[in-house]
């Protein structure tokens, strides 16, 4: 059945011609904990959303995407790996593969997560976008250890009086300052 709906928050060109922006993140509960969901551009260009999900307790992040080769070689895998490392979260990413009328898509569906080698991302299934095997039309599964998704920066740090390394109050002030600029008001 339906567990909810997510509307993509950020729309790259040409999507505003046929879609409207969403305004809310989407987290759903599972027996293994909360899971966050985002779509394509939300993930690759707006890291705040993944960080929000990790801070809310998500150890798994789902990225539905249609990343084409015209977006360059660095955007996809580099962003996913960095998000996995900096937020200490698993990412399940499903990308289109092959060609449509206008685009050639990388493929690169994968399950990426924290490694036992700290500050490294590991591909538990699938391949980076630019790997020649990424174009495979295939469904991937993997057994993952959610204990590796420590999200330590979102937990109390005894070395700084129990506060967290992540400091949303500071970012709130920074964003409130940005909102004074009319170009950022909706």
Segments the model singles out, each with a brief description of its role:
Residues 30, 41, 95-98, 146:
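Short beta-strand segments enriched in hydrophobic/aromatic residues
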Residues 39, 113, 143:
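Pocket-edge structural micro-motifs
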């Amino acid at each position: 059945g339906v567990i909810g709906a997510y509307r993509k928050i950020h729309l790259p060109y040409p999507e505003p011609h046929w879609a409207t922006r969403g305004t809310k993140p989407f987290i759903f509960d599972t027996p293994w904990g909360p899971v966050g969901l985002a779509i394509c551009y939300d993930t690759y260009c707006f890291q705040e959303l993944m960080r929000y999900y990790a801070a809310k307790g998500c150890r798994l992040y789902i990225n539905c995407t249609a990343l084409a080769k015209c977006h360059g070689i660095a955007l996809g895998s580099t962003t996913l790996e960095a998000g996995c490392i900096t937020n200490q979260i698993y990412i399940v990413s499903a990308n289109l593969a092959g060609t449509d009328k206008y685009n050639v898509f990388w493929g690169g569906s994968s399950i990426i997560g924290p490694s036992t080698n700290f500050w490294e991302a590991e591909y538990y299934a699938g391949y980076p976008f630019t790997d020649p095997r990424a174009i495979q039309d295939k469904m991937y599964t993997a057994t993952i250890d959610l204990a590796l998704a420590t999200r330590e920066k979102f937990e109390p740090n005894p070395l700084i009086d129990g506060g967290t390394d992540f400091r949303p109050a500071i970012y709130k002030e920074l964003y409130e300052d940005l909102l004074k600029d009319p170009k950022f008001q909706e």
